[in-house]
Amino acid sequence: MDFFISQFISGLSITSILLMIALGLAIIYGTTGVINMAHGEFVMIGAYTSWFLQTKLGMGLIASIIPIFLITAAMGFLIERLIIRHLYNRLLDTILATWGIGVILQQLIRLSVGSELKYLEIPSYMAESMSLFGQQVSIYRVFIFLFAIAIFILAWLIIFKTKFGMKLRAVTQNKDMASCFGVNSGAVYSATFAFGTGIAALAGAFVAPLKSISPDMGTNYIIDAFMVVVLGGVESLIGTAASSFIIGETSSFIASFSNDTLAKALVLVITILILRIKPQGLFTRKIRS
């Protein structure tokens, strides 16, 4: 029983990171219809921004959360305004453009701070462990899990309970009709892209103390994030949360009997088999029709 509890808790840690990354990806696609191939690079930018703020400016992790979000959200906003805005409804062009943006961001990091690995330590006040279901669990991992849940709830409230969310849903349902009622679809798209990239950056900031920081670190997470979004239903927020849990827990248990590489491969196979049965994903409620 202790083994299963331990692996379940480990799976929740994976779930937390996947949820934040995939949530941003799902929001961007669900609203704009853009498959953002550079999404992993925003995870990387978040990690490097956290490293810079903590090691160069002396800011703590908690204090750096808002600056990390704002800096990366501003980048996402500008990219949408300057590049993505001119490519809507051109699927292959947006895929190629966002892939190119990702490559450029990686090279900019290599040129500015180098390719060597960077490391961050877990804040001392979160480095201790606490007892949970009879297991010793890192306070930092518990914090990440609670923060991910808070971000998901915040995103849901914004989309379904605010005036901006009403405009967002109107634009995704029928852009032309929404424009007739005075909704600025361009502003909605820009804000959505900024919010989605900002969330991805926060995931990178939180994963930085757990893993090494490198220019290509985002590649390791974007594949899993795409699996989460597709499995849950490409345009379903609830599906994104549920599939994050499913993939996180499945990866944890498989890795305990083998290794991370085999676990990722088997999870991919399982995802493909599920999609053969339910091509639209496990959940069908949509942001975008």
Label the model's feature ranges.
Residues 58-102, 108, 155, 242-247, ...:
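Alpha-helical transmembrane segments within multi-pass membrane transporters and channels
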Residues 2-11, 158-163, 189-229, 235, ...:
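Inter-helical junctions in multi-pass inner-membrane proteins, predominant
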Residues 24, 72, 224-248, 269-275:
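Hydrophobic alpha-helical transmembrane segments of polytopic membrane proteins
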Residues 42-45, 52, 85-110, 218-230, ...:
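Pore- or pathway-lining transmembrane helices of multi-pass membrane proteins that form conduits
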Residues 1-20, 49, 61-64, 90-95, ...:
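Membrane-interfacial amphipathic/re-entrant helices at transmembrane-helix boundaries
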Residues 14, 136-213, 237-242:
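Helix-loop-helix "hairpin" substructures at the membrane interface of multi-pass membrane proteins
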Residues 86, 90-161, 187-191, 253, ...:
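Transmembrane helix-bundle core of multi-pass membrane transporters
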Residues 4-54, 82-93, 231-234:
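Single transmembrane alpha-helix segments in multi-pass membrane proteins
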